[in-house]
Amino acid sequence: MFTYCRLANTKETIEHLLKNDEAKYSDLIIYSDAPKNERAEEGVKKTREFIHSISGFKSIKIIEREKNMGLANSIVDGVTSIVNQYGRVIVLEDDLSVSPYFLKYMNEGLDRYEERKDIASIHGYIYPVKKKMPEALLIKGADCWGWATWKRAWDVFCFDANVLYKKILNAHLEREFDFNNSYPYVDMLKRQIDGSAGSWAICWYASAFLKNMYTLYPGQSLVQLNDIVGDGATHGSTPIAYLVDVKSTPINWNLVEDQTESLEGRKAFELFFKSLKTWKSYIPNFLIKVMRIFVR
């Protein structure tokens, strides 16, 4: 879990995690980034006091950064360290709330697909698409809102956006990468290259995409994005369009469609992305969100 200076959000994330039966069998590793300015100092201090009081997990390890790394560098460093030690990782940031069945889904998914070299990650959030989705489905690429992966998949991660961008252009994959031109992922890579973004997630998506690897999404979200704003936010403010009804039952693996990518799912994502353009009053937040999703 990655935290910064938002005490209330950190508490909420932990409270939801503890509602998972698997929490008491789970090793919780918390990365607490250092304040990047004086304004964040008090929030970081209070958040660190709280995380040192947490109980209810099998074990708890806290890494307090001495200097501000920024979320992108902190996540890349933390995930790399954990998969090198444990071979797998479940990743949460402090502005995500999870279903009581989140850890069950993640652990079962990690076990089920460990040997599937074409699967990059297990993801807990799915957009509130209009069409009913299968119990779980595969989409090409990787994602970043409550996810899990293995060392063998994280090893394909490339943090060089220029390399990724050139590969996508050379293979003429821009349209597919952008979900039929419905979402500006290629632009995110370009922003990363020119220095106007500092992203890990767009590089994670592109790395898996170029290797023809897939992410498993639940048909109904097991993760909710908390509506937060300000300097401590890891995702920026959350437009209403992204809010979901969280799944209240476990995943039924007998109903999962996991043989190949779901074309139905891709189309549903595309339609959702296009629908965002109708949210005129949320355009500023949407642009912030695109940046915050991938400025990490």
Where are these regions (language model features)?
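An acidic/histidine-cluster motif and surrounding catalytic segment
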Residues: 1-91, 96-296
